[in-house]
């Protein structure tokens, strides 16, 4: 395909046909399990507070709103889906567009397809098993292996991420020739993420999908803290062939604690010179009303299709990437 023929799709028609078949297979997977498909808004008056996520922002001007209302394209359908769960919908899944104003490349596009689902009364491990079932069905891969975050660091970096101080983390970074970044970084979780990305990720999920679970409590996000070890959160991620595929939680149900985490995120944003984000009060109200004990996971569909087709880039499985949109 000529590089100048930008009117043409980035993916081939045969690949788009295969993609459609995978989307249908995903829907059958959940239909067979009695999980309800839902649709939620792509825009919201509130957004994520995570310091590592950057949402797109737009402005609505219409009848009754002459001054305009700020709206954010959703980075994930999580908040709306939790409101449905609190309203009593039962197990749900969604295939939807999500948007992040971040990088673009082989594994990233600002607009992408997300598969997100929630299972009331599932703990983290039971949901991990279901994710594994889906991956085996779509990718025809081996059953996954599982490592705790602590085990992964000890195996590949010979350091305990739960007890190491910042000096020890910088020493580990120096062994990876990352001192130019690590020596000026004061945030411990950013150091851990640097080590994980550069020192752990390249070694996991080569032959089979790998679950990494029990992330540090400081990286809990919207996950519960483990009742067995308060140093870790009931959160997991899935990696396969160099790609992060999914991120899941045993979901936090405490509205007050969730609000405190959002506020802490905004304080971190302010310290880094980033804009503070509006907190989703509707989500907090839903948690206060009673979110059922549940686990949920978000999975990147474009990356899943890329792996299933043996493609080299998301551009091979997306009809029009952002540079052709």
From Swiss-Prot:
Q: Which GO terms describe its cellular component?
A: cytoplasm
What happens on changing residue 108 to A? No effect on activity
- EC category name: ligase
Drop me one GO molecular function for this one.
Answer: acid-ammonia (or amide) ligase activity
Q: What is the effect of changing residue 102 to A?
A: No effect on activity
- List GO BP terms, alphabetically: lysyl-tRNA aminoacylation
Q: What is its EC number?
A: 6.3.2.-
What keywords tag this UniProt record?
Answer: ATP-binding, Ligase, Nucleotide-binding
List the PROSITE patterns. AA_TRNA_LIGASE_II
**Could you say what the effect of mutating residue 244 to A is?**
Loss of activity
Q: What is the effect of changing residue 118 to A?
A: No effect on activity
Residues reported in the UniProt entry to bind substrate: 76-78, 118, 251
Subunit structure of this chain's protein: Homodimer.
Say which family it is in: Belongs to the class-II aminoacyl-tRNA synthetase family. EpmA subfamily.
This protein's name:
Elongation factor P--(R)-beta-lysine ligase
Phylogenetic placement of the source organism: Bacteria, Pseudomonadati, Pseudomonadota, Gammaproteobacteria, Enterobacterales
- The gene that this protein is the product of is epmA
């Amino acid at each position: 395909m000529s590089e100048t023929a930008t009117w043409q799709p980035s993916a081939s028609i045969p690949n788009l046909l295969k993609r459609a078949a995978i989307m249908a297979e995903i829907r059958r997977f959940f239909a067979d399990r009695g999980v309800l498909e839902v649709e939620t808004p792509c825009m919201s008056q509130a957004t994520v507070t995570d310091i590592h996520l950057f949402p797109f922002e737009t402005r609505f001007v219409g009848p009754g709103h002459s001054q305009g209302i700020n709206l954010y394209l959703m980075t994930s359908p999580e908040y709306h889906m939790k409101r449905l769960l609190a309203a009593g919908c039962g197990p749900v899944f969604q295939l939807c567009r999500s948007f992040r104003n971040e990088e673009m490349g082989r594994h990233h596009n600002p607009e992408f397809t997300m598969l997100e689902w929630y299972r009331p009364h599932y703990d983290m491990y039971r949901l991990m098993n279901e994710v594994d079932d889906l991956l085996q069905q779509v990718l025809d891969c081996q059953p996954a292996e599982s490592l705790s975050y602590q085990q992964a660091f000890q195996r590949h970096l010979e350091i305990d991420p739960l007890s190491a101080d910042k000096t020890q983390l910088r020493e580990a970074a120096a062994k990876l020739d990352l001192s130019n970044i690590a020596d000026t970084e004061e945030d411990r979780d950013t150091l851990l993420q640097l080590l994980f990305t550069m020192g752990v990720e390249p070694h996991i999920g080569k032959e089979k999908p790998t679950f990494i679970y029990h992330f540090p409590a400081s990286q809990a996000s919207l996950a519960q803290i483990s009742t067995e070890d308060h140093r870790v959160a009931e959160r997991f991620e899935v990696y396969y062939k160099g790609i992060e595929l999914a991120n899941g939680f045993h979901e936090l149900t405490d509205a007050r604690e969730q609000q405190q985490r959002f506020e802490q995120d905004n304080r971190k944003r302010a310290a880094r010179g980033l804009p503070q984000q509006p907190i989703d009060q509707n989500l907090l109200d839903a948690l206060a009303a009673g979110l059922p004990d549940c686990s949920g996971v978000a999975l990147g569909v474009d990356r899943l299709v890329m792996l299933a087709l043996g493609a080299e880039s998301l551009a091979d499985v997306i009809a029009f990437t952002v540079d052709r949109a």
